[in-house]
């Protein structure tokens, strides 16, 4: 019996539903002191003086530390595997606290008190003297001569620049009869809005620092804490229990280094830091706002002669994940619609906004909005159905990327497009809605494709480890460094392990928490990598454990290993399937045999030197109220080729979650900042327009299963892709309904009113 491919219940569902699941805050020592951070209320300034005497004198305050008290060990925060090559290491530009304020919310002091209320009161007693500096919020203005400089090491505020050149762009655009289509596209700064705010607590044990934290990347956080404190990494232990979502925000070391340092300054006493929602909004990480400029030179039949992309990514105040986001988005441009003559450039620049980091999609939602909006602009210029255009130009089967050398093994783009078009009746509806509409309610349909890599090879290391232990009752314990953050990977790993070893699903226990003292190494949850990369480690370890079990069965039965098999937790004879013994019987004998006691375990590391393309598309149907300037999404469908589905119900849930995120990206979500001060204006769940359940349309997920040949279980990326294509599909549906092209999201009523007025569709 194979468990891969079955919709088994989540292994953590009962504990979470019953409230038994223990998160970092639930595990916090009741004696722990509370630390609250003083965030600067300036966009750009030097801290000249901090007077904390009143705060220190308050009852219940244990200590106050300022930016002048902390060690000057610069460290990176991005959750990437360590590189032994200095040029590939993340930028180390952070201190525990800083005297150079680079955004409104930067950390300049911390109060440690016996309780949270006292700590908050003490913060209000701290007086700060600033030397104000000019600031810049716009990414292109930050690159202009004379703009305020944020980091001496990066002249012109440019953190990174990359380019792609293929063919001869200038020669190609001279071809007679070409149609030039040009557009500028903007995506906003948004926040992850995971349920659980970031929190951590730290203490000392045996001269070592222990941090219990809500993180996606425990093994990487250990290294970063060591760097920040200037101590050997082995002197740090990180424990990751259940966590309530992350979406990339927790793929940075956020406050773990500061929390760890505080316990070292307070005699090893436990100290906790828990972010308020307002802090999470603008003091953690945000999604990069990216401005894109695209020019396509198109033949009348829809084929491209030449294409150009320029994009500018707003990094905010610190490097975090840096230029990788813009570079990944740029690299998708020549792949999704191959063209022989390409010029691409991407820049990432510092501004005085909150640091931008990883967020679900890692640059692809921004690139997909710009790229897919542009494709519909091209189809409109050609007077061609957008589906027909994409049929002509989408990445073909057998395509090999010139740079990564990854190969597209399937014709998934077309399979997904056709499945979605048929299910939504797209071609008929598009033609119907394209006819002139004059009423106050107008309808339209739109579509968008996406492309996504699985993991980070060959840009960075991809490896994963797994340990399996045969317990005396015949059950299997599985440990891996890959992290469950709410997406369901523990369930998927249990299904994989059951198949790899040959035991029932119910007898597999995946240890959900990670502890860097005992858990095998894994990079963690990011890049939609865990099912693919972790699957290699589970398959390799499972095969090794199975081999050792059958070797011991050979000892007990005196039968050749080649005649034995392990099926559903039973040792059977291959020729006739006769059950020889239960695995529990073998395990007990192995543990307690006076003649040959064996603790049957297996551990293996898999280094992955392959990558897999995931493909898909979104189809949207909208209703536009021309009088109220409101968009109502009537139907949204995502179609995915994510390889073989390990658990179809979990896959569907992933898609629905991503579609919800894409809806907000399209219609409502945007962090706003005061242009005169740099202060965030809507850093809370009341003013930040996160969509509610009532705002969601009918959402559907379709899958075109196509087993990935490089994967031991046929899997590839699904975690992030569902968020990539809904926004441009909705934008394109509005174009179909109204004839008006919107080149920025979110498409709010205010934006609709302004554009409709410019187009002469509404009166004052």
Where in the sequence are the language-model features?
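Helix-loop-helix junctions that connect adjacent transmembrane helices in secondary transporters/permeases
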Residues: 147-229, 394-475, 604, 681-693, ...
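Short, aliphatic-rich beta-strand segments
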Residues: 35, 209-213, 475-480, 633-635
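Glycine-rich loop/linker segments at domain edges
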Residues: 6, 12-18, 85-88, 156-200, ...
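Short acidic, glycine/serine/threonine-rich loops at helix termini
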Residues: 74-79, 122-125, 222-224, 247-253, ...
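C-terminal catalytic domains of large/alpha subunits in multi-subunit enzymes
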Residues: 67-68, 230-235, 264-272, 300, ...
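Flexible, low-hydrophobicity surface segments
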Residues: 1-155, 183, 267, 593
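Thiamine diphosphate
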Residues: 246-274, 489-497
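Helix-loop-helix module between adjacent transmembrane segments
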Residues: 207-209, 243-250
């Amino acid at each position: 019996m194979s468990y891969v491919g079955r919709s088994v219940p989540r292994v953590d569902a009962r504990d979470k539903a019953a409230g038994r699941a223990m998160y970092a805050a639930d595990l916090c020592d009741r004696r722990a002191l509370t630390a609250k951070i003083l965030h600067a209320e300036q966009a750009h300034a030097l801290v000249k003086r901090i007077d904390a005497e009143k705060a220190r004198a308050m009852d219940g305050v244990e200590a106050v530390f300022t930016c002048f008290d902390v060690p000057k060990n610069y460290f990176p925060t991005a959750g990437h595997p360590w590189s032994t090559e200095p040029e590939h290491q993340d930028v180390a530009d952070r201190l525990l606290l800083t005297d150079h304020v680079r955004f409104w919310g930067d950390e300049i002091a911390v109060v440690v008190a016996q309780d949270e209320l006292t700590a908050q009161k003490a913060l209000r007693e701290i007086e700060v003297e600033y030397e104000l500096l000019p600031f810049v919020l716009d990414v292109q203005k930050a690159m202009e001569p004379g703009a305020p400089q944020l980091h001496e090491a990066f002249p012109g505020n440019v953190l990174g620049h990359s380019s792609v050149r293929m063919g001869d762009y200038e020669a190609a655009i001279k071809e007679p009869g070409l149609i030039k289509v040009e557009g500028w596209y903007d995506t906003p700064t948004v926040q992850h809005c995971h349920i659980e705010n970031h929190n951590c607590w730290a203490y000392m044990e045996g001269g070592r620092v222990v941090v219990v934290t809500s993180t996606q990347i425990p093994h990487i956080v250990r290294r970063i804490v060591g760097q920040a404190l200037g101590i050997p990494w082995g002197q740090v232990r990180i424990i990751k229990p259940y966590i309530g979502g992350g979406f990339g925000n927790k793929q940075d070391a956020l406050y773990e280094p500061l929390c760890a340092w505080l316990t070292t300054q307070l005699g090893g006493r436990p100290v906790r830091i828990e972010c308020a929602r307002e802090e999470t909004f603008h003091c953690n990480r945000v999604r990069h706002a990216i401005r894109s400029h695209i020019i396509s030179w198109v033949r009348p039949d829809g084929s491209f002669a030449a294409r150009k992309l320029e994009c500018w990514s707003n990094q905010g105040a610190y490097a975090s994940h840096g230029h990788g986001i813009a570079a990944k988005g740029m690299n998708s441009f020549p792949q999704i619609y191959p063209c022989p003559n390409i010029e691409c450039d991407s820049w990432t620049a510092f501004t005085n906004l909150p640091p931008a980091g990883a967020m679900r999609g890692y640059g692809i939602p921004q690139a997909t909005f710009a790229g897919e909006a542009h494709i519909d602009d091209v189809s409109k210029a050609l007077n061609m159905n957008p589906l027909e255009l994409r049929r002509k130009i989408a990445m073909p089967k057998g395509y090999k990327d010139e740079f990564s050398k990854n190969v597209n093994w399937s014709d998934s783009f077309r399979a997904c497009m056709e499945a979605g078009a048929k299910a939504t009746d797209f071609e008929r509806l598009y033609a119907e809605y394209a006819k002139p509409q004059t009423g106050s309610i107008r309808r339209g349909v739109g579509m968008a494709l996406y492309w996504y890599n699985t993991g980070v090879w060959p840009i960075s290391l991809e490896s994963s480890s797994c340990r399996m232990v045969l317990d005396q009752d015949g059950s299997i314990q599985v440990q891996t460094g890959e992290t469950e953050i709410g997406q369901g990977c523990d369930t998927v790993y249990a299904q994989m392990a059951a198949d790899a070893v040959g035991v029932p699903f119910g007898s597999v226990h995946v240890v959900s928490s990670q502890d860097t003292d005992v858990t095998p190494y894994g990079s963690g949850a990011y890049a939609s990598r865990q099912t693919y990369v972790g699957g290699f480690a589970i398959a390799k370890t499972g095969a090794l454990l199975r081999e050792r079990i059958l070797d011991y069965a050979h000892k007990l039965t005196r039968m050749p290993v080649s005649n034995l098999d392990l099926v559903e937790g039973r040792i059977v004879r291959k020729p006739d399937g006769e059950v020889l013994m239960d695995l529990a019987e073998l395990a007990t004998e192995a543990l307690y045999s006076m003649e040959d006691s064996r603790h049957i375990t297996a551990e293996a590391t898999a280094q992955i030197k392959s990558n897999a393309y995931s493909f898909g598309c979104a189809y949207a149907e909208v209703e536009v109220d021309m009088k109220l300037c409101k968009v109502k999404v009537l139907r949204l469908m995502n179609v995915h080729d994510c390889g073989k589905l390990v658990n179809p119900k979990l896959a569907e849930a992933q898609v629905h979650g991503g579609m919800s995120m894409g809806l907000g990206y399209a219609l409502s979500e945007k962090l706003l900042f005061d242009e005169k001060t740099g202060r965030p204006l809507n850093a809370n769940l009341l003013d930040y327009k996160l969509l509610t359940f009532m705002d969601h349309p009918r959402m559907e997920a379709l899958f075109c299963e196509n087993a990935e040949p490089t994967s031991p279980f046929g899997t590839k990326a699904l975690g992030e892709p569902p968020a990539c294509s809904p926004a441009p599909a909705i934008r394109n549906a509005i174009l179909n309904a109204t004839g008006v092209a919107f080149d920025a999201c979110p498409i709010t009523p205010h934006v609709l009113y302004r554009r409709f007025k410019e187009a002469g569709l509404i009166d004052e």
